[in-house]
């Protein structure tokens, strides 16, 4: 293999020039999480620039044709036909991406993540201007007054921007629930219309099994299918038990509330765990001491990546299931005719069961992020089991 004329992209991803496609993807995904601006609040602009360079490197090296062009002629001759995609696309596609859009809509936490990034950069620029005003000359009473006025106006604008973002979030969620509800209604209506015979029912089961097998190969595909399946089966069983036993529906609703509470706790604790590890790593770097070997530091970085991913996935799952519960509830309201409501519940239970039974391929080399989370869970479980009991 000839030596590439330019190695900048390889250096950015920290890989050798003979790295395999899997090695390239692993390196990119690890760095994309590490340098995402949302995970670097102290320097969102610098992290954003680094993130974009990493993304650009992956888009070239991850494409066999572009990589060949890059190796032979350099990066000027290795540009995608449609241009480079931005960093937003990475996190949009991290949890399912376009193939799942019809099922769960666009994840709100991704949109909010980038809204906050833009706000942080804008606020940082405003603070720099205010600081320049103070440092430009002797801070006379007039300059101090100008500084205080600007600071006050900036705070007002910040509150207004926050209120605007919150309103946008509410409207985005309302629209997303509406679209997911409409898509689900079409699917349930189709199921009800075709499931009138044993042959039709078997054909539907085969159709959704094939669709699930297609979706499972997407990033976090199996996990998202399980999240969808859990909500569908829970909602379907609640309606069917309420119709048959009455009290059974009550216990199903209580069980659902318990799962929501657990999911909330998982999301919060995962975020706290990730932040603690990031803070520990930052303290180590701030000291500037070689307290850990390269191997130990690499393990720590990998552990942090796993924790960040776990926190991100917990947030994504919470987001997905919250929207799906609303969509299912819209289609199972008591004002819906009883017969139709029961048929929809049966259809939800069928589809949910198919999705819940999907299994991951343990040898799939593309399940890099998912396996990192799995390893992180194993470490947490092992750590909790290793803790000695408290003295009484």
UniProtKB/Swiss-Prot annotation:
Domain J, first and last residues per copy: 7-76
Domain of life: Eukaryota
Any one GO molecular function term: Hsp70 protein binding
Pfam families: DnaJ, DnaJ-X
Modification sites for Phosphoserine: 108
Record has Manganese as a keyword: no
InterPro entries, A to Z: DnaJ_domain, DnaJ_domain_CS, DnaJ_X, J_dom_sf, Peroxisomal_DnaJ
GO cellular component terms listed in the entry, alphabetical order: cell division site; cell tip; cytosol; mitochondrion
Biological process terms in GO annotation: protein import into peroxisome matrix; protein insertion into mitochondrial outer membrane
Keyword set, alphabetical order: Chaperone, Phosphoprotein
Matches recorded under CDD domains: DnaJ (cd06257)
Protein name in the entry: Uncharacterized J domain-containing protein C4H3.01
Organism of origin: Schizosaccharomyces pombe (strain 972 / ATCC 24843)
């Amino acid at each position: 293999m000839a030596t590439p004329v330019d190695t900048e992209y390889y250096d950015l991803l920290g890989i050798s020039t003979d790295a395999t496609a899997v090695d390239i993807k692993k390196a990119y995904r690890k760095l994309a999480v590490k340098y995402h601006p949302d995970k670097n609040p102290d320097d969102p602009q610098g992290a954003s620039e680094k993130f974009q360079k990493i993304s650009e490197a992956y888009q070239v090296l991850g494409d066999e044709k572009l990589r060949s062009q890059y190796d032979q002629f350099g990066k000027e001759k290795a540009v995608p036909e449609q241009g480079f995609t931005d960093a937003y696309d990475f996190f949009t596609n991290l949890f399912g991406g376009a193939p799942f859009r019809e099922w769960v809509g666009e994840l709100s936490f991704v949109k909010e993540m980038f809204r906050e990034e833009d706000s942080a950069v804008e606020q940082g620029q405003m603070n720099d201007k205010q600081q320049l005003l103070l440092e430009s000359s002797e801070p006379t009473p007039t300059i101090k007054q100008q500084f205080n006025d600007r600071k006050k106006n900036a705070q007002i604008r910040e509150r207004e921007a926050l209120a605007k973002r919150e309103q946008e979030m509410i409207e985005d969620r309302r629209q997303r629930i509406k679209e997911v509800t409409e898509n689900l209604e079409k699917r349930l209506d189709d199921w009800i219309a075709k499931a009138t015979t044993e042959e039709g029912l078997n054909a539907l089961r085969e159709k959704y099994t094939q669709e699930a097998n297609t979706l499972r190969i997407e990033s976090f595909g199996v996990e998202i299918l399980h999240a969808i399946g859990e909500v569908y089966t829970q909602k379907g069983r609640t309606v069917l038990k309420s119709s048959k036993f009455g009290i059974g529906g009550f216990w199903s609703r209580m069980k659902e509330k318990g799962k929501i509470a657990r999911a909330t706790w998982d999301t919060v604790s995962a975020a706290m765990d990730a932040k603690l590890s990031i803070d520990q790593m930052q303290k180590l770097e701030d000291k500037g001491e070689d307290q850990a070997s390269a191997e130990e530091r690499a393990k720590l970085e990998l552990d942090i990546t796993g924790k960040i991913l776990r926190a991100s996935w917990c947030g994504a799952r919470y987001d997905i299931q919250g929207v799906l519960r609303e969509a299912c509830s819209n289609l199972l309201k008591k004002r819906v005719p009883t017969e139709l409501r029961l048929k929809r519940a049966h259809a939800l239970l069928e589809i949910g069961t198919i999705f819940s039974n999907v299994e991951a391929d343990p040898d799939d080399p593309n399940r890099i992020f998912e396996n990192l989370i799995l390893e992180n869970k194993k470490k947490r479980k092992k750590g909790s089991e290793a803790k000695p009991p408290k003295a009484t």
